[in-house]
């Protein structure tokens, strides 16, 4: 199969993904990017809706694991506080952290998805490893570099526009 940089699915927010939506697609493990996917870069405190989503997902049959490029201790502390496994220093888009997660859970790539806000790290990493790639709208583009990166991603989002899932459909 040819490699694609297009996401498999696009959602406006991580909280639009439901356990039923993922299970219907055969997803048993959802890997999550951390910064700008779960919380903004500028805080460690999730919004109440995100906090409820994390709780609901943990109560479901879908396993969660944060796979982050961050070397910052805040990711580990957050995950410990919320009872979520995490892999830091993941080096996305390279397969290191994603493969580590696959080994940890003993699941094939076809039963896993990675949700994140960046095409050039999260989507590419998921696609390199054969996972379902879920592009999430970034929580906050608080600086010029994040805004520039998202502008560079617009052509990919345009070509994948028919993969957008509305909240009502999930």
Predicted regions, residues:
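Asp-based, Mg2+/Mn2+-dependent phosphohydrolase catalytic module
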Residues: 2-32, 39, 43-44, 48-114, ...
């Amino acid at each position: 199969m040819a490699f694609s940089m297009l996401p498999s699915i696009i959602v406006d927010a991580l909280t639009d993904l439901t356990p039923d939506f993922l299970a219907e697609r055969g997803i048993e493990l959802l890997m999550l990017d951390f910064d700008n996917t779960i919380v903004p870069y500028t805080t460690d405190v999730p919004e109440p809706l995100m906090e409820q989503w994390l709780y609901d997902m943990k109560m479901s049959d879908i396993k969660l694991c944060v796979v982050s490029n961050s070397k910052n201790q805040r990711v580990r502390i957050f995950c410990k506080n919320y009872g979520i496994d995490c892999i830091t220093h993941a080096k996305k888009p390279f397969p290191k952290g994603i493969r580590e997660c696959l080994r940890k859970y003993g699941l094939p790539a076809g039963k896993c998805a990675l949700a994140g806000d960046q095409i050039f790290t999260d989507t590419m990493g998921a696609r390199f490893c054969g996972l379902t790639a879920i592009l999430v709208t970034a929580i906050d583009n608080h600086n010029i570099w994040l805004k520039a990166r998202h502008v560079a991603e617009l052509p990919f989002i345009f070509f994948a526009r028919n993969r957008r899932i509305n909240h009502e459909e999930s």
